[in-house]
Structure formats: structure tokens, C-alpha cells
A protein has these predicted regions:
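Acidic, glycine-rich loop-and-beta core segments that form the ion-binding/anion-interacting portion
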Residues: 2-56
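Internal helix-turn-beta structural module
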Residues: 124-158
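Short loop/turn segments immediately following beta-strands, especially the blade-tip
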Residues: 38-47, 91-98, 138-146
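Beta-rich, blade/repeat-based domains predominating
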Residues: 7-23, 55-75, 109-122, 153-165
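Short loop/turn segments immediately following the C-termini of beta-strands
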Residues: 30-31, 40, 83, 130-131, ...
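Beta-propeller fold detector
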Residues: 1-5, 47-55, 100-107, 147-155
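C-terminal hydrophobic structural anchor segments
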Residues: 89-137
């Protein structure tokens, strides 16, 4: 049997990232502009909602469309992307409890950051900016909890997904 949960009206759940320990899950809500943390009861197969944090800055009053959620290799940093706000948000994950703490926002350096991913060895982070036809390369400093732009911009017509082989 598969567990299900009722999201808040108009939140529109979009992507979920599972922590490497398989006990925590992080769901980004497209219209609600929230990241929801769930504990996962793997014995009973239940998702237990525990925390909601905004994906947009508190002072931002415009519309938003959250698009993707992604964890770093060790499950220490959670990243969410915001399409209309043209940004990403970083959260630190408490490894004992799974709770999130907002670390800050970074400009997407382009329009409509639709997809985010790491390269296979997690040394670089990539953001596909659909409406500016660019892929932005960044480097995550997990220890400090911040992103650094590498200066590399890859031209790509309307990128919406990135895969590595």
C-alpha cells in the first residue's frame, strides 16, 4: 500500500527529494512557494509532515513558482529553485532531526530556473534557466552553506532538464 497525504489547497506539490538516510523527505510546492519537510516512517510507509518554510524571501510580495528540490550528496544542504523570482534558496538540514534552517537566496543569473542538479561527483551545481537559454554552473560550499558562481555560462536553447552520462 502506498501512503498519500493531502496537501494544502493550492500548494501544488511538484518535486520531492529523499534524504540519504531515507528517513526525511523534502517536497517543494509550486504555487504555495513552500518547502515541506516530512519524516518518513519506513516501518509503516507513512510520510509525516513536520515543517514548512518559504522558498521566497519574507520581503518579496510578487508571485512565485517554485520548481525543484535537490539535496547535496551528504544530505546537509537542501536547494530549492524559484522560477518567477529567478532565484534559488538554500537550507541547512539538521542531521539528527531533519528540520530545515534557511541559509539564504541566490540570483539565478537568468530567467526561469526550471531544473537544478549536481554533476556525478557533486563538485559542480547546474541550473537550467529555461527562458534565458542558459545553464549556469555554480559550486556549493556545504561547510559554509553557500553557493559560489564559477563564471561558466553554457548556452542551451530553452533548457528544462540536465542529465550526465
Amino acid at each position: 500500500e502506498t501512503d498519500c497525504f493531502r496537501s494544502r489547497e493550492y500548494d501544488e506539490p511538484r518535486h520531492i527529494a529523499i534524504h540519504p538516510n531515507n528517513r526525511y523527505a523534502y517536497l517543494i510546492n509550486e504555487k504555495g512557494n513552500k518547502m515541506t519537510y516530512f519524516g518518513f516512517d519506513d516501518v509503516n510507509g507513512k510520510l509525516l509532515p513536520r515543517q514548512n518554510l518559504p522558498t521566497l524571501p519574507e520581503t518579496y510580495t510578487g508571485e512565485g513558482q517554485a520548481s525543484a528540490s535537490l539535496l547535496d550528496k551528504n544530505g546537509e544542504i537542501l536547494i530549492g529553485s524559484n522560477r518567477i523570482h529567478e532565484s534559488i534558496v538554500l537550507y541547512r538540514i539538521d542531521q539528527e532531526t531533519g528540520y530545515m534552517k534557511e541559509l539564504g537566496y541566490y540570483p539565478a543569473m537568468g530567467l526561469t530556473p526550471r531544473f537544478i542538479t549536481f554533476n556525478p561527483d557533486y563538485s559542480r551545481f547546474y541550473m537550467a534557466n529555461e527562458d534565458s537559454d542558459t545553464i549556469i554552473e555554480m559550486k556549493l560550499d556545504s561547510e559554509q552553506g553557500r553557493m559560489e558562481y564559477t563564471g561558466r555560462v553554457i548556452a542551451a536553447e530553452s533548457p528544462v532538464c540536465i542529465t550526465f552520462r
